[in-house]
Amino acid sequence: MSGLLQLDEESLYDHIFERYTLLTSNNDSLKQDLGIVDRTVSKITIDIDQFDFNNKKSNNDFYSIEINQPITSLNSSSVNNNSTTGYVVWSTTPFFTRWLIFHSNASIFRNGGSIELIDQDDELKLPPMFSNSVGLLELGSGIAGILPVTLGNFVGSFIATDQIGILSTLKTNILENLSQLNRKIVTSRSLNLNLDVDESTLLKRSLLSLECLPLDWELFDIKDTTKLDPALLSLFKEKETIYVLAMDVIYNEYLIESFLSTIQNLKSLAFKFNVNLNCLIGIQLRSEEVTTLFLEKAIIDYEMKVYYIQDNILESSRFSIYMI
């Protein structure tokens, strides 16, 4: 079962030491790579399934996603302002998706409830993530569209965001994998889908509002909400709870400041509209210095409450998930 370890300006260093020591002890059983699933092919299949395949009960317990990768863009110095990491599939997102949907340890996040605060003799109440009253907002989606076409089955709204140069391939991949959204009727202005849905259709499956929007962390500003994208503004006006998801976006020191500024702005927006907002940030553990700097900036400079999700499945992997 998962628990939350709140980090402060002192305990973060103990946490970093212990987590990277554990990572080193597991090195023999873990892949030693940067985390790209396969940079040699232009089309890749990602399967998301049960941890115990013998418990598979229906087609709803398995997802197979076909992803187009513009691998020539990964090595280009002229596309997307030379920011090219989003053009391939990274392993953090499939790992997180499988853990969240299928593992019993993640049920507290799926269904909500009280989760143990480690070393505090206390608990924190989490709202359910899997509910039609919940919206998911993904930062740094990349081109794959894995989270929208899987987690979209369990929520009322999903907004996938990235820099504008990424969005065309992201939209293509989502459209080609709509069959994975087998629990929902999808409506979307950005994808031009089912803008007029009749009531008889909604009797069979519930509605998912799914949008792909540009969101540049360095330019994101909430001072004038009338300038925000209408779909993003509607998310904050209409949903009781929003979970922000950001998978493998912390991989160098240059992105940390603008990312945390964006999280801070989103939290301010949530406060304005009385929305319960939590952020789940998945990190592949590469540079100890980058992970430390991220935690220092979040906890010390931005004075954010940062929790480490302590979980045996996560700790036997190369990934850490933090909640802000």
UniProtKB/Swiss-Prot annotation:
Family matches, as Gene3D superfamilies: Vaccinia Virus protein VP39
Cellular component, GO annotation: cytosol; protein-containing complex
InterPro entries per UniProt: Methyltransf_16, SAM-dependent_MTases_sf
EC assignment: 2.1.1.-
Statement: the UniProt record of this protein carries the keyword S-adenosyl-L-methionine: yes
Natural source organism: Vanderwaltozyma polyspora (strain ATCC 22028 / DSM 70294 / BCRC 21397 / CBS 2163 / NBRC 10782 / NRRL Y-8283 / UCD 57-17)
Enzyme class label: transferase
Gene field: RKM5
GO-annotated biological processes: methylation
Role description: S-adenosyl-L-methionine-dependent protein-lysine N-methyltransferase that methylates 60S ribosomal protein L1.
A single MF term (Gene Ontology): S-adenosylmethionine-dependent methyltransferase activity
Family named by the database record: Belongs to the class I-like SAM-binding methyltransferase superfamily. RKM5 family.
Keyword terms: Methyltransferase, S-adenosyl-L-methionine, Transferase
Record protein name field: Ribosomal lysine N-methyltransferase 5
PANTHER family the UniProt entry points to: HEPATOCELLULAR CARCINOMA-ASSOCIATED ANTIGEN, RIBOSOMAL LYSINE N-METHYLTRANSFERASE 5
Residues involved in S-adenosyl-L-methionine binding: 90, 140-142, 162, 217, 247
Keyword Zinc-finger (UniProt): no
